Amino acid sequence: MKFNKLNLSHCISFYISEVSEVFFESINQHPSRDFVNNILQKIKTTLSEEELEKLNSIEEVTKDEKIVIMLNHVLKKIVSKTGSSKCDLFNVIKQDRFNSPVYIQSINAFENNLINNEFAERRYDYLIEVNKNSYLKKFVNSIRISFFLDLRAQILSGSFTLNLVNKSIEKQKKTEIFKDIFVNALVKHFICNQLYPISLNSFIFDSENPSNKLALKERIKLLKTNWNSLFFDKFYNCLNNKNKQQLQETSDEMFYAVINTYLIMLISVEELRVYFTSKEPALILKVLDKKNTLREDPDQNPETDLYELIQFIEQNYLKKDKKTSWNKKKVQDLEQLLEEINKINLETKNESLAYPDEITELEIDNDNFVSTKQVFRNQLELQLLHGIVINPEKYGIGMWSSYFADWSEYKNLIEQMLNPKSGNDFYQFEKDIDESICQINKKYLTFISSDSNTFLIVKNDDVKVISNYVWAQLFFETRRWIINDIEFDLYEKGFDKSHFSRNIALLESLSFSWLDPFYGLTSIKEIMQKIDSKSNLKTSIEEMVNRFKHEQRINKKDNERVLMIFAYIAAFVVGFINFFSMVFTILTVSDLNAGLTVPNIIVISIASVLAFILIVIAVLFRFKWKHIKH
C-alpha cells in the first residue's frame, strides 16, 4: 500500500476565565439572524449619535476581522523583537490598509449554515504560517489558534495546534515516518518533563531583583543542558553523523525553536486574556486600528530572540506590583526548581497551557475504509504505525516513560517488527484495533489512545477531517483543565467554604449531555462520545458537583451546629441570671432566716440541679464537638 503524506500535530489547550460580559452582549452573538439583519437596521435610525456609537462599539468587539487586528498587532511586536531584517519568523499573508504586514489569517473550517450560525459567531479559527527560512521551521510549520466564547460558563475555551510534520512520503522509505514520530516524541517528552507547568513563570522571574536576572540565565542554561543531554544521549549519538559541531548547531536551533514557539503561544494567550477580560475592549481596538510604527531590532540569533521575548513579556504581562522571587539557595535540582515555580504560579494570574495532545494524520492510496481488517491486513508498516501512535509506551517513547528508548533501540525494534518472519500476532492486533477505533467512514478510519490524548487518522487524500478532532479536543481538554485547576485548589488550599457556590455554578455550566449543540458542530459529537468513554469526563463533572454539594450540606449543618452552640450559651447565661435573681430575691429580706423556708430551699435545690445539668450538657457538647471535628 502506498503512503502519500504524513501530518503530525500537537494540540495544546488553554482557557481564559472571567471573560467580560461585553462579549456576550454583542449583537453579533444574537441567536436570531432576522433580528440582526432586519429589525436592528430600523432601530439604528432612531438612535442618537452617542447611542449609535455605543451600539457600534458593542458590535465591533467580537467581529472576526477585529480579532485579527488584535492578534496581528502582537505578532508584529514579536517580529520586531526577533529574527532579522531579511527573515521574519512568520510569513506575510498580505498588507493591511496602512501597508503594514499581516501575519495571521482567518480560516473557515466549517460551513456557516442557518442551524449553527449562532455558534459560528462565537467560534474563531486563525492560522499563522512560519517562514520556511526561519529557525522556527526546525520545529513547527504553522500555528493554528482556535477558540470559542462559551456563554454558559462565561469563559474562552481555546487551543493551539502546532503542525510539526507535513511532508510527502511518496519518494521516501516508509520507515522515515517512524523517525519523525520518534524525534517529536522526544520533544514532547522534554516539554512535559522539563517545561511543565507551561506558563510565563516557568521562564521568567522578577526583573527588578538582580539575583533573579542571574536566575533566569541559570534557568535557561539548565534547560539547554538538559535538552542537549537528552537529545545527544537518545538521538544524535546514535546517528552515523560524526560532525559534532553540526549536530550541536542543529540541537541548539531546535532547542530555541521549541522554547520560542511556546513563548509566542503564551504571549498570544496573554494578549487574548487582556482583550477578552477588558471592560472596554472597544478602546483597545481604537488604539490598535491605527498606523503603528514598530522599531525593528538589529539582526540577531535565536538565543537573543529568546531573551528579547522574555524582556517583552516582563514589560507587558507580568504584574509590576507583584514581587515574584524564588529561593535560589533552596534550589539544588530540577524537582526543587519546579516546586518553586508552582508556588509562584499560585501567586499570579497569568495563564498556562495544558499538556500537548497529538494528532497523526496519514494519507494512503485506498478508496474504501469500511473494513479495518481489509485496510490493515498484510500491511506491517501501517500496523506498526498504529501501535506506535496509540500505544507509544510499548515502544519506549511515551510522554511519561520512566525510561525513554534511544534511537538505536527504537530502530532495531522497528526493523524487527517489520520483518515478515517475526511472526506478528494479527489476532492480538485486531483486539487493539477494536479497542482503539473511534470512527469508521468510507473515506477514513480514526483511532484514539486509552488516555484519549492521542489520535491516529488514516484517510485518502481528498477528505479533510482534522478540524473535527481539533475542536473535539478543545471542548474536552479545556473542561479537563478547569477541573484540574479546581481540584488543585481543593487539595492545596483545602475546602474554601466561600467558593462552594461559585465552584458548583462553574462545574454545572461545564456539564453537558449528548443533546447539546457542541459549539454548533454536530460532526464532532461521535468523537466526543468516544473520548468520554475513555476519560469519563461527563461522569467526573457530575461526581465533583455532587461532592461540592455534599460539602456544602455539611457546611450548612456545621453552621446550624454553631447556631445551636450560641443558643445553648444564651440559654446558659439567661438561666444563670434567672437562677441568681431568684436566689437573691428569696434571700434578700430583713430577716435572713425568714427566707430559708422549706419551700424556698426546695426551689433553690431544684434550680441548682437544673443549672448543674445545664453545665454538664454544655461541657459534654463541647467535648463531642471537638471529637467530631478531629
Swiss-Prot record:
This is Uncharacterized protein MG242. It is found in: Cell membrane. The chain crosses the membrane at residues 254-274, 504-524, 564-584, 601-621. Coiled coil: none annotated. GO terms for cellular component: plasma membrane. Its main location: membrane. It comes from the Bacteria. The keyword Transmembrane applies. Keywords: Cell membrane, Membrane, Transmembrane, Transmembrane helix. It is a multi-pass membrane protein.
